Amino acid sequence: MASNVLNRYLFEDLSVRGELVQLDEAYQRIISSKDYPAALQKLLGELLVSTTLLTATLKFEGSITIQLQGDGPVSLAVINGDNEQKIRGVARWEGHIADDATLHDMMGKGYMVITIEPKKGERYQGIVGLEGDNLEQVLEGYFERSEQLKTRIWIRTGEHEGKAHAAGMLIQVMPDGTGSENDFEHLEQLTNTVKNEELFTLPANELLYRLYNQEQVRLFEPQNVEFRCGCSRERSGAAIVTVDKNEIYDILASDGSVSLHCDYCGTTYSFDESDVNKLYEEAASEPKTLH
């Protein structure tokens, strides 16, 4: 069974490239960090697939963040991924969300922000309205406006054998492509036939053969996708010592401990008075850096 993997492929005779992402554990880690409503779990899965497909286009070390903001019950949904396919995500909501809520039911009047941050170089940010019925159409609109390349995206979420899965495919005309409009439409029609179970379970080579067995498809080396939030007890301790000391000891006096919660993975780090004393002692003993 295919899981937590990104595959890139090329239609050699048609100047069209493709991507296939298949996620289970990475998706499950994100939606298990909070008691997300079913529709919001689905939206996070779609956003996760979208971000992974986008990070596959990175030709440098860096990260991409796709963020949805709106005035509906869901005020924020965000997924961050990097060129190594380390991903994390979180959403914020208020009130009841129906199981069959749509993108617009959840976000209301909103927009999508795509932020590309190279480790070296300038940060880029693009903002698009939530135009279209779903995230597929919003993202296709972004590609056509920003890259001016014909792009089609398929995103699916659901359960297989009792576990949550998210998967997606992308096909896009190459910038120097010589293929015809009919070629691209033909590939669209073939990809439209893909079934959820195939996307969730089949290895890339088998799935691509089922869809495109009459085409010359070159499949590149796969890349693993992994949930990684970046939190740690050490980072939490470092954050505590940046806060006013009196404020920290006031919290200790009233609550008995200072706690920091990671929204991405759901872990809570607690520090009692002896822990906090040790943090400040270690901070005081560190050599000062002169600027």
UniProtKB/Swiss-Prot annotation:
GO terms for biological process: protein refolding. InterPro entries: Heat_shock_Hsp33, Heat_shock_Hsp33_C, Heat_shock_Hsp33_N, Hsp33_helix_hairpin_bin_dom_sf. It holds the Pfam family HSP33. One of its GO terms (molecular function) is unfolded protein binding. Disulfide bonds join 229-231, 262-265. It is found in: Cytoplasm. GO terms for cellular component: cytoplasm. Under oxidizing conditions two disulfide bonds are formed involving the reactive cysteines. Under reducing conditions zinc is bound to the reactive cysteines and the protein is inactive. Keywords: Chaperone, Cytoplasm, Disulfide bond, Redox-active center, Zinc. Its main location: cytoplasm. CDD domains: Hsp33 (cd00498). Signal peptide: none annotated. Redox regulated molecular chaperone. Protects both thermally unfolding and oxidatively damaged proteins from irreversible aggregation. Plays an important role in the bacterial defense system toward oxidative stress. NCBIfam families: PRK00114.1. Belongs to the HSP33 family. This is 33 kDa chaperonin. It comes from Vibrio vulnificus (strain YJ016).
